[in-house]
């Protein structure tokens, strides 16, 4: 399938960012979560940690204090599901109220009024050419900073079992090393090679058609996190399904992450978090102190701290134990990971 779409100029709404609500870390025994649900974790080039929530906007830890940006601070998004940084150091947020750009001083909001496919955003990536690809409830948009262009994918059967009522919803977008674009939908994965778009589904060996996340690891394997049948990966045209015989339990997987050492991490609903070191799958959960069975994202920052986000907020894993991290911390690792 070739690119097809519309072009339109953008005159997005800008709002100066007032001083954010700030909490400074202090010694405390009571943990007040950053938010009841953390959906996305991202570290920008200056070392600030951003935490996208499922209803409270975004929180930012700058190494000294936590800043909160929500509707009260003129940040219109409530659920923040995607965070990226462009080459000009602007931070982009994919939210349930449109695409939001933060330049360090003000927020600029882009919605369907400017040409976005849908205001409910689920994924964003910046490709090798610097273009934003935005996966929404109503399809895919590309954005060059001035103009939105629609990218057409085939309609798929909605996944009503998980509340997906749209034929165009795109859960995730990934660009592989060859430059191909991958899209996760309720009808399997689609891969675009610059000329045509190919569907990859259960008929081809995919473990489940409801794809929540896609990752290419450093070895070139393409991993899929699915909603009903866990994790699988693809080498060439061959799929390998990760199951209980590999030591992995559960079926609902939302996130895939490769750490700097090449380990693959993925949380599975009601089964904690798994790490694959290339040979063995290791589970981390209640035995290590994790107090929730609903982790949705994992991330290692440049200082080596490993973060987990999900229901009940933010957690940090030091290699042996998992602790809750709230508005007042604790933010620093007390022992080497």
Question: How does the language model describe each region?
Answer:
Residues 1-337:
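Carboxylate-rich, polar loop motifs that coordinate divalent cations or form catalytic acidic clusters
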